[in-house]
Amino acid sequence: MLKTVHQKLLHHTRPLLAWLKLLWRRIDEDHMTTLAGNLAYVSLLSLVPLIAVVFALFAAFPMFSEVSVQIRHFIFANFIPATGDVIQGYIEQFVANSSRMTAVGAFGLIVTSLLLMYSIDSALNTIWRSTRSRPKVYSFAVYWMILTLGPLLAGASLAISSYLLSLRWASDLDGVIDNLLRLFPLILSWAAFWLLYSIVPTTQVRNRDAVIGALVAALLFEAGKKAFALYITTFPSYQLIYGVISVVPILFVWVYWTWCIVLLGAEITVTLGEYRKLKTEETEQP
């Protein structure tokens, strides 16, 4: 009896262990942590210019003025744990100063923002080991569309949500709405990762693999956010070491951790497809 149970357990766990071994090998071969470090560095250079460009777009549309404030608070509350208020103050000061920049300065901000998108594109295609490249004009058009339409669509979505919540019938669903609002950051992260893993690679990605990889990345992101905030509030030793500039290493570590999660989700997505391909080849062999 015990021998039968043991054999069944081995039968079910052997594929999982083989897949985990393949995942670990790919992470090592792709130098995932090094890629995450590169993206973290570029992100820190591009973060403020990107936010400046996004909120400059909101400022160009008066209808989004109130929504932009809500989006700003949502981003800093849900995507930058514990130190969001301090970082928000610095970034808002920069955004206010950026409105007085010349055309050359504004062009520099846009180029820096596009640099981040290009780096993400390169890193993900490195993980997928895709040798195919898009035409430069097409890539620029996609980056520009994300940079311009992305914030506007997010603003329109939040505006519609606020309008629906203000309707009379919504008051009868307070409990349901509260639960949905708690899940909203997770759902948003899941959707964002799924789009990232589905659209950015220049090779075909199976939708189910992208959904699974995105879900794991979203769950790790939410768990990591809470764990990181708990560490910062419970063990504030970093403040004794860095003093008033402690927000800088905190932000860098968080951005690096975030990119590790994003790239791990990509590795999971691509490994699911590769493992399935290997199993198919083994089955077809005589």
From Swiss-Prot:
Write out the similarity annotation: Belongs to the UPF0761 family.
**Subcellular location field:** Cell inner membrane
Carries keyword Membrane? yes
The molecule here is called UPF0761 membrane protein KPN78578_41360
Q: Which residues cross the membrane?
A: 44-64, 74-94, 104-124, 140-160, 183-203, 210-230, 244-264
State a single Pfam family of this protein: Virul_fac_BrkB
Keywords (alphabetical) are: Cell inner membrane, Cell membrane, Membrane, Transmembrane, Transmembrane helix
Q: What topology in the membrane does the UniProt record assign?
A: Multi-pass membrane protein
InterPro entries associated with the record: UPF0761_bac (IPR023679), Virul_fac_BrkB (IPR017039)
UniProt keyword Transmembrane, yes or no: yes
Signal peptide residue numbers: none
For this record, the Gene Ontology CC terms, alphabetical, are: plasma membrane
Main localization is membrane
